[in-house]
Amino acid sequence: MSQVNFLTSSPVHVTQRELIALSGKAKIIPLEPNIIKSLQAGSYVSQFKGRGMEFDESRPYQPGDDPRNIDWRVTARSNQAYTKLFREERERPVYIMTDLRSNMHFATQGSFKSVIASYSAACISWAAHHRGDRLGGIIYGDSNCQEIKPKLGRQAALRYLHKLTDHPDWKTSFTENDSNQEIALLNAVISLRKIVRPGSLIIIVSDFLGFSQKSRSYLSRLSQYNDILAIFINDPIEEKSPPPGKYRLIASKNDILIDTHSKQARNDYSNSFKLRRSILFEFFSRYGINYINMTTKCNPIESLISSLKRKNK
């Protein structure tokens, strides 16, 4: 996988100009419902469920109708079961949920996770625009969660990039504790569930720290009616501890001291991350969520292009 040598001028921050410049490269990133395929080993691949479905009308329930489409409001008023009918929307909504929590402003190699996430989100924003899809999503940090309703056109992509580069969490000066990270991610998933309509494509870009059982529950429900692609970002030091010694790491503007003299401590460190990643990928596979694994030293543009390959029906 290519080292970080893309357009970023800083490994710790992004500019709107840099993200706008990705429009041309994004033209070759495939987002068609039937062709997104993760090439990461062991990943689950499922065909996308298609474009968004827009409510058309309700009619009396008939044998064979999907019980999940029962119109409970009309049913309650008429005292007779009614089912919702949908028509296919011309444009499929694409929602990108980008993680800018304090834990994302970290790297020992390459660029911050937040930089890799922003470049990935920007490329997908432009790819959605080039396909004629409507673009919206969630951009969230430790305490600021912004909802962006889907719209069409170049302005929709520019709006997303503007909110991405102007998000207040780029100025964070501390790292939240585990419980706050968990709450921030949960609130973002809850917000996502409120704005997403059935038949959408959802892209989640995160390191998934604090991915609680409640967050899993909400995301599993979203996966029933939508197609989800998760982009999991980690730093190489999370996979394998450095050689024996004492090291000072910088997360946001905080210093973290780690001691790796003990072999047992090094093994426990590596095994802890492997277990977390294994549980995460197992969850993705169980619910048909496609995924890509990126690191802070990769080129996110090339990773997206190489990981998303055409799949004929």
Please provide the spans of the model-predicted regions:
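Acidic, metal-associated active-site segment
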Residues: E57
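Exposed, interaction-prone extracellular/peripheral surfaces
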Residues: S2-Y44, P60-D65, V74, T83-Y119, ...
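A positional/architectural concept
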Residues: F48-G52
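N-terminal low-complexity, intrinsically disordered segments
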Residues: R68-S78
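Active-site SXXK
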Residues: I124
